[in-house]
Amino acid sequence: MEEWDVPQMKKEVESLKYQLAFKREMSSKTIPELLKWIEDGIPKDPFLNPDLMKNNPWVEKAKCTIL
């Protein structure tokens, strides 16, 4: 590790204190909640629900052509 001067060390300590203050939760709890949130949003997500893409006027209708 390279030599650090005092301001760099202070910034590093400040950053570590900031990270330590974050509220953390167990992955075993948050991952199922995230999956449920994603699954609940599928009917409203135009990228996952092709019927919603049909109503979007900005979607390109033509396919790409390779020259």
Swiss-Prot record:
Gene Ontology terms describing biological process: phospholipase C-activating G protein-coupled receptor signaling pathway; sensory perception of taste
Membrane topology term: Lipid-anchor
GO molecular function: G-protein beta-subunit binding
Chief location: membrane
Keyword Cell inner membrane: no
Source domain of life: Eukaryota
GO cellular component: dendrite; heterotrimeric G-protein complex; membrane; plasma membrane; synapse
Lipid moiety-binding region (S-farnesyl cysteine): 64
Localization, UniProt: Cell membrane
Residues that bear Cysteine methyl ester: 64
Entry keyword set: Cell membrane, Lipoprotein, Membrane, Methylation, Prenylation, Transducer
Entry keyword Coiled coil: no
Residue numbers covered by the propeptide annotation in the UniProt entry: 65-67
Oligomer and partners: G proteins are composed of 3 units, alpha, beta and gamma.
Stated role: Guanine nucleotide-binding proteins (G proteins) are involved as a modulator or transducer in various transmembrane signaling systems. The beta and gamma chains are required for the GTPase activity, for replacement of GDP by GTP, and for G protein-effector interaction.
Cross-referenced PANTHER family: GUANINE NUCLEOTIDE-BINDING PROTEIN G I /G S /G O GAMMA-13 SUBUNIT, GUANINE NUCLEOTIDE-BINDING PROTEIN G(I)_G(S)_G(O) SUBUNIT GAMMA-13
Family according to the record: Belongs to the G protein gamma family.
Protein name: Guanine nucleotide-binding protein G(I)/G(S)/G(O) subunit gamma-13
Species this chain originates from: Mus musculus (Mouse)
Gene: Gng13
